[in-house]
């Protein structure tokens, strides 16, 4: 889950068009990747050699298990370096399929190396001391090797279901690419209400914002019927496959892979639902402020712009570096030093561009054992959400650096997605908070504080909506109560209302199911964001209560890799076993405190301060 889910996507067009207002344009950088490989030819030669080393290891006889495992571990470190390098090359030029094809090969190679290592662990004597640091990996390997009740059935189900699910995901993309989004011509500028959704949401012209909001939903609705067929068909196949393989429902299987179960998820969702009034209160506060600022009968599209007269600045890269570093001061000088080094333009560890060109619109860390961490951002607009994206990916990159410091096994660098993502979301929350704390103008403080609160809404409420909606769709298909686009609209409206939205006033929101990409591309993955967000907000809370102890716990877990069950690592982070409903209450308490601070800022702005 390295690619970050956000409320927004890159809003390059509008920011670059408005750059003179800010006085600074975003800067481009190319990362120096020679610390990974001198060039593509060197990478190819090293990859060929690694393939031969693995083949030799797999066929070698007379090697002690500990030595065989150590060799596989070293090979995995090399393989991760190839993966990082090729991921970067493929993203730099999305039109060149050669790096992407090589990346696919490397992913297969890394998987074979990992399987070889797990096989050694399974076969090692129970009392072998060298296996102690790999107890969690060994337990997974033993579980993985357990023969299913009907192995032939399992293989047959996978052989049929996997291609079908891939086809549904591709079909979703094809259908939405043909969606008919209204086009707008205004002041010599052409706007596409689909492509320019976020740019229109931030435009100072109220009529243009409204047209953009309504046009986006109109475009989604234009493909409502075929999208319903795709989603319902996908759910039917995925759920049937899970049940045939003895995993219960597809959502239950997803929860189990996270280290949770249906009852735990349901309890968490219910706890969030009990706070729906907090979300409604926040939304109403934004609407009241818009009304007091002179907007007649304000609507949702009137809450997405800064206060009149305030233009958020575009940060130069050194400013971004300093802000991100200041945001994480409580983690100590070592962490801050690594973060500054990563984000210092002079070190050429960031790969950023101001125009897309042939680049992928993606963002991810570039990290491998024995190599300096870097990061890639397809397009940096200089707008706030673009810089938050950099802070987020920097959190992922620093996680890789800390695992290297902690000598984490290359075989244990990847673990539970929701825990991995929580670390990066924590960095983005801190980045927003730092911008809020250092701002002086009340309008600037309100702008940055609202962005922090909106992020928390995303992590807590939107994630809950998505998890509940996906679970409910699977349940409805299983009991035959869902079968049409109208059914999906009605169900979506019910879920949104439960978590504080107003589909009665804004009926377009009932079409939200159409735009939930991960429901189609990675079924039952969205619930990971709920727990990532819950934990990230709690990390933000705890680092203020007891900074010294928190720093020790956090950096210890950050450096060890994924050598334990995720709930055990969360227990160490929090100082106690996670009680998810209680964490919901604690997170929402802080949310409401921050909302009160924003309310006070609104009062100052309405009195004319900061004008």
Feature names for model-found ranges:
Residues 9-20:
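Bacterial N-terminal signal peptides
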Residues 22-26:
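Sec/Tat signal peptide C-region and signal peptidase I cleavage site
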Residues 27-310, 323, 496, 564, ...:
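A well-structured
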Residues 38, 139-147, 259, 295, ...:
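C-terminal, non-catalytic "cap/extension" segments appended to globular domains
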Residues 246, 381-401, 424-425, 532:
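Active-site recognition of the HExxH zinc-binding catalytic motif
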Residues 312-316, 370, 374-390:
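Short pre-active-site segment immediately N-terminal to the catalytic Zn-binding motif
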Residues 313-315, 348-372:
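Catalytic zinc-binding patch centered on the HExxH motif and its immediate surroundings
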Residues 414-444, 452-458, 532:
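Post-HExxH zinc-binding segment in Zn-dependent metallohydrolases
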């Amino acid at each position: 889950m390295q690619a970050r889910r956000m409320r927004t996507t890159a809003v390059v067009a509008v920011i670059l068009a408005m750059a003179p207002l800010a006085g600074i344009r975003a800067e481009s950088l190319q990362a120096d990747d020679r610390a990974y490989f001198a060039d593509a030819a060197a990478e190819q030669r090293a990859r060929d050699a690694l393939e031969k080393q693995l083949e030799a290891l797999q066929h070698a006889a007379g090697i002690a298990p500990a030595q065989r495992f150590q060799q596989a571990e070293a090979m995995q470190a090399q393989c991760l370096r190839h993966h990082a390098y090729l991921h970067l090359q493929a993203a730099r030029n999305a039109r060149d399929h050669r790096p992407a094809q090589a990346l696919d090969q490397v992913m297969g190679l890394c998987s074979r190396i990992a399987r070889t290592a797990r096989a050694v662990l399974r076969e090692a004597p129970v009392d072998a001391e060298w296996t102690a640091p790999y107890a969690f990996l060994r337990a997974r390997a033993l579980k993985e090797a357990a023969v299913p009740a009907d192995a032939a059935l399992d293989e047959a189900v996978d052989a049929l279901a996997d291609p079908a699910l891939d086809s549904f995901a591709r079909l979703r993309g094809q259908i939405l690419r043909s969606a008919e989004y209204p086009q707008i011509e205004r002041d010599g500028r052409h706007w596409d209400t689909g492509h320019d959704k976020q740019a229109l949401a931030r435009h100072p012209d109220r009529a243009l914002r409204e047209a953009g909001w309504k046009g986006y939903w109109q475009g989604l609705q234009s493909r409502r019927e075929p999208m319903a067929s795709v989603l319902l068909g996908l759910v039917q196949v995925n759920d049937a496959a899970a049940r045939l393989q003895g995993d219960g429902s597809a959502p239950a299987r997803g929860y189990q892979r996270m280290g949770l179960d249906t009852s735990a998820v349901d309890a968490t969702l219910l706890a969030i639902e009990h706070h729906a009034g907090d979300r409604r209160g926040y939304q109403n506060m934004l609407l009241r402020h818009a009304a007091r600022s002179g907007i007649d009968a304000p609507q949702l599209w009137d809450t997405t712009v800064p206060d009149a007269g305030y233009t958020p600045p575009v940060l130069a890269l050194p400013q971004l570096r300093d802000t991100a570093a200041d945001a994480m001061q409580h983690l100590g000088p070592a962490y801050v030093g690594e973060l500054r080094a990563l984000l210092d333009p002079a070190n050429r560890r960031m790969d950023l561009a101001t125009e897309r060109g042939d680049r992928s619109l993606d963002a991810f860390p570039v990290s491998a054992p024995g190599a300096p961490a870097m990061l890639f951002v397809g397009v940096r607009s200089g707008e706030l959400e673009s810089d938050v994206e950099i802070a987020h990916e920097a959190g992922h990159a620093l996680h890789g650096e800390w695992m290297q410091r902690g000598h984490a096994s290359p075989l244990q660098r990847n673990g539970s997605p929701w825990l991995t993502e929580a670390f990066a979301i924590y960095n983005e929350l801190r980045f927003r908070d730092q911008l809020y704390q250092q701002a002086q103008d009340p309008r600037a403080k309100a702008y940055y504080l609202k962005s922090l609160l909106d992020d928390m809404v995303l992590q807590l409420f939107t994630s809950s909506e998505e998890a509940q909606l996906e679970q409910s769709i699977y349940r409805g298909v299983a009991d035959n109560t869902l079968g049409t686009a109208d059914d999906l609209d009605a169900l979506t409206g019910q879920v949104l209302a439960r978590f504080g939205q107003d589909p009665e006033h804004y009926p377009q929101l009932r079409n939200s199911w159409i735009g939930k990409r991960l429901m189609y591309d990675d079924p039952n993955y969205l619930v990971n964001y709920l727990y990532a967000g819950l934990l990230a907000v709690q990390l933000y809370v705890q680092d203020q209560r007891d900074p010294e102890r928190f720093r020790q716990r956090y950096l210890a877990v950050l450096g060890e890799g994924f050598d334990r069950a995720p709930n055990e690592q969360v227990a160490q982070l929090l100082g106690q076993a996670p009680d998810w409903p209680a964490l919901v209450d604690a997170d929402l308490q802080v949310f409401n405190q921050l909302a009160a601070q924003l309310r006070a800022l609104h009062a100052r702005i309405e009195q004319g301060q900061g004008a």
